[in-house]
Amino acid sequence: MRYFPLFLDLDGRDVLVIGGGAVALRKVETLRLAGARVTVIAESLHEALRALAARGGISLHERRFESRDIEAPGLARPRLIIAATGDRDVNAVAARAADAAGIPCNVVDDREL
């Protein structure tokens, strides 16, 4: 078995979601149910993410993800990273940066990354 299923206690932990579409929204909703503190970085954002941020549920950064965001001043170091951009190149950058920082990363719908 090459891949190992993993459960994380994310209550009160910081999670970075990269991507702002419908898939990212579903991940954010699930992470919030788990008690995670969620930061989203995306060039464009689903309106439901904006609404959630307006209620103080998540932190949003409307811009392109850069690998330095993982250790950026002003952003909490995440316990987990979710790459859900729909852009394989951006997801690959996120996966490599997470690996270099020793942070688990889930790239949505791409086991190879």
For every predicted segment, state its role:
Residues 80-113:
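ADP-ribose/adenylate-binding Rossmann-like module
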Residues 10, 72-76:
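A short, aliphatic-rich alpha-helical micro-motif
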Residues 38, 60, 104-105:
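Hydrophobic beta-strand scaffold residues
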Residues 43-45, 65, 109-113:
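Short, ordered loop/turn segments at secondary-structure junctions
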Residues 53-59:
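Structural recognition of alpha->loop->beta junctions
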Residues 63-70:
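Conserved SAM/SAH-binding loop
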Residues 1-53:
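Hydrophobic, well-ordered beta-alpha structural blocks that scaffold small-molecule cofactor pockets
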Residues 56, 75-80:
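Short acidic/histidine-rich motifs immediately flanking catalytic phosphotransfer sites
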